[in-house]
UniProtKB/Swiss-Prot annotation:
Species this protein is from: Hypocrea jecorina (strain QM6a)
Keyword Cell wall biogenesis/degradation: no
Binding sites annotated in the UniProt record for Mn(2+) 2: 67, 236, 285
Gene3D superfamilies membership: PPM-type phosphatase domain
Textual note on the cofactor: Binds 2 magnesium or manganese ions per subunit.
Protein name: Protein phosphatase 2C homolog 2
Residue spans of biased composition, Acidic residues class: 375-387
Cofactor(s) recorded in Swiss-Prot or TrEMBL: Mg(2+); Mn(2+)
Keyword annotations of the record: Cytoplasm, Hydrolase, Magnesium, Manganese, Metal-binding, Nucleus, Protein phosphatase
Length: 438
C-alpha cells in the first residue's frame, strides 16, 4: 500500500484563462498522498519560433499534464520546460509540429540526463500534451495520462495508455532486454513510456525510441469541427476513477450550468477523492485536470449558451443536473454513463462514482476502455496485484492491466508539501521500504 496521510490535502491550485479562440481551466490537488508529484503547463499564447509568422501563421497554445513517480523533480522540469524545448526543435521550426513534438520529448529527456543537477535522479513522469495551432490539435503522449475530446457529449480519446502488457510495448521491452512481470516493466514500473526513469534507458546500443522504457510519444493529429466542444487532459488520478465518457458528460453538465472550467475540474477531483485512505488505492492519488474549450469564433458567453442549448435539447449525452452541484471532497455521485459512440466504453460499464464499480480504468491501444475487476485494496500490493489479469480484460483484446506503481527506491530529498495553514499531516505508519510509489 502506498503511503497516505491521516487526512487528505484538499486545497487546490487552480487557474483559468481565455482569448478569442480558447477558454481553459486547470486544477491540481494533492489528495491523500504524502506529497504532490504532478505538474502541468498552460500556455495560452506562445510566440512562434524565431518570431517566424510566415512559417507559423497561427497562434500557438500548449497545455500538458505530467504525473510524477518516485519524486517530483522530473515532472516539475517537464512542466516548466518541455514547451520551450519543443519549440527549439528544427523540425518544429520548419512547421512539422508532429515531428517537433516527438523530437521535443526526447530532447527533454536528454536535457534532464545531461544536467549535473539531476545526476542521481531516479524519478520519472508521464507527459500528455496538446499543441493547438489554428484548427488543429496535436496530442503527444508518453505514459498513462490521457487526452479526451468531447464531441457533442461523446468522448473520443486522443491518446493511448502506454501499459507494459500491450503487445507493441511488450515487444519493445523484451527486444531491449527487459521483461514484463505482474504488469510491470522488469517487475517494477507499471507504465512503459516516460520521461526520466533512466535506470531503464541504459543500453548504449539502442536508440532512445527502442530503450526498455522510452520517452518517445505517440502523436495524434485532429482537425477541429464545430461539434468539438472541449478537450480534457488529466493524470490517472482521474482516469482510475472515471471512464472517458463519464468525464466528458460531467464536464458538459458543468458547462451547461455556466461554471468556470477550473471549478469543474475542482468538482471532478472532489468527486473522485476517496472517502478514506484505508485501501490507499483508487481515489487516493494526486489529481491534475485541464479543460480546454474551443470557442469556434463565438464569445465565451455564446459558447456556454450554445452547449447549454444542446444539452437542453438532448443533443448529445450529459450527466444529470445534480452533477453540477458542489458537494465537497469525497461525496460521490453514482450513475451509468452513456455509450460514447467511439467504441471506448463498451467493455467498461463505467460508473461515475467510487461508490459504484471499483477498479482501474484504462484505455487500451485497440480502442477499448476497460474497467478492471480488482478491488483497490490490490492496487498497491505488489504480491497480489494482477494475479488474475486474464479474467479482468475481455478475451478479444488480449491485453491486461495494472495500476501504475513502482517498487520503493531511494529518491533525492524534496521539499515536503504542506496544507495552506502550514500544519503537517500525520503519515500512516509505513516505512518507504514497505511502500511503492505511484
Amino acid at each position: 500500500m502506498g503511503q497516505t496521510l491521516s487526512e487528505p490535502v484538499v486545497e487546490k491550485t487552480s487557474e483559468k484563462g481565455e482569448d478569442d479562440r480558447l477558454i481553459y481551466g486547470v486544477s491540481a490537488m494533492q489528495g491523500w498522498r504524502i506529497s504532490m508529484e504532478d505538474a502541468h503547463t498552460a500556455e495560452l499564447n506562445l510566440p512562434p519560433p524565431d518570431n517566424d509568422t510566415k512559417t507559423h501563421p497561427d497562434r500557438l497554445s500548449f497545455f500538458g499534464v505530467f504525473d510524477g513517480h518516485g519524486g517530483d523533480k522530473v515532472a516539475l522540469f517537464a512542466g516548466e520546460n518541455i514547451h520551450n524545448i519543443v519549440f527549439k526543435q528544427e523540425s518544429f521550426k520548419s512547421g512539422d509540429y508532429a515531428q517537433g513534438l516527438k523530437d521535443g520529448f526526447l530532447a527533454t529527456d536528454r536535457a534532464i540526463l545531461n544536467d549535473p543537477k539531476y545526476e542521481e535522479e531516479v524519478s520519472g513522469c508521464t507527459a500528455c500534451v496538446t499543441l493547438i495551432a489554428g484548427n488543429k490539435l496535436y496530442v503527444a503522449n508518453a505514459g498513462d495520462s490521457r487526452s479526451v475530446l468531447g464531441i457533442k457529449g461523446r468522448a473520443k480519446p486522443l491518446s493511448n495508455d502506454h501499459k507494459p502488457q500491450l503487445e507493441t510495448e511488450k515487444n519493445r521491452i523484451t527486444a531491449a532486454g527487459g521483461f514484463v512481470d505482474f504488469g510491470r516493466v522488469n517487475g517494477n514500473l507499471a507504465l512503459s513510456r516516460a520521461i526520466g526513469d533512466f535506470e531503464f534507458k541504459k543500453s548504449a546500443e539502442l536508440s532512445p525510441e527502442n530503450q526498455i522504457v522510452t520517452a518517445f510519444p505517440d502523436v495524434e493529429v485532429h482537425e477541429l469541427t464545430e461539434e468539438d466542444e472541449f478537450l480534457v487532459i488529466a493524470c490517472d488520478g482521474i482516469w482510475d476513477c472515471q471512464s472517458s465518457q463519464a468525464v466528458v458528460e460531467f464536464v458538459r453538465r458543468g458547462i451547461a450550468a455556466k461554471q468556470d472550467l477550473d471549478k469543474i475540474c475542482e468538482n471532478m477531483m472532489d468527486n473522485c477523492l476517496a472517502s478514506n485512505s484505508e485501501t490507499g488505492g483508487v481515489g487516493c492519488d494526486n489529481m491534475t485536470m485541464v479543460i480546454i474549450g474551443f470557442l469556434h469564433g463565438k464569445t465565451k458567453e455564446e459558447w456556454y449558451d450554445e452547449i447549454a442549448k444542446r444539452v437542453a435539447n438532448g443533443d448529445g449525452p450529459c450527466a444529470p443536473p445534480e452533477y453540477a452541484e458542489f458537494r465537497g471532497p469525497g461525496v460521490h455521485h453514482n450513475y451509468e454513463d452513456s455509450d460514447s459512440g467511439y467504441d471506448v466504453d463498451a467493455d467498461s460499464g463505467g460508473k461515475f462514482s467510487l461508490a459504484g464499480s471499483r477498479g482501474r480504468i484504462i484505455f487500451l491501444g485497440d480502442g477499448t476502455e476497460v474497467l478492471t475487476g480488482s478491488d483497490d485494496t490490490e492496487m498497491f500490493d505488489n504480491a497480489d496485484e494482477d494475479k488474475d489479469l486474464a479474467s479482468q480484460v475481455p478475451k478479444s483484446s488480449g491485453k491486461t492491466d495494472a495500476k501504475e506503481e513502482t517498487e520503493a527506491k531511494p529518491a533525492p530529498e524534496a521539499e515536503s508539501s504542506k496544507p495552506a495553514d502550514g500544519s503537517e499531516k500525520k503519515q500512516d505508519e509505513k516505512t518507504p521500504e514497505e511502500s511503492k510509489k505511484d
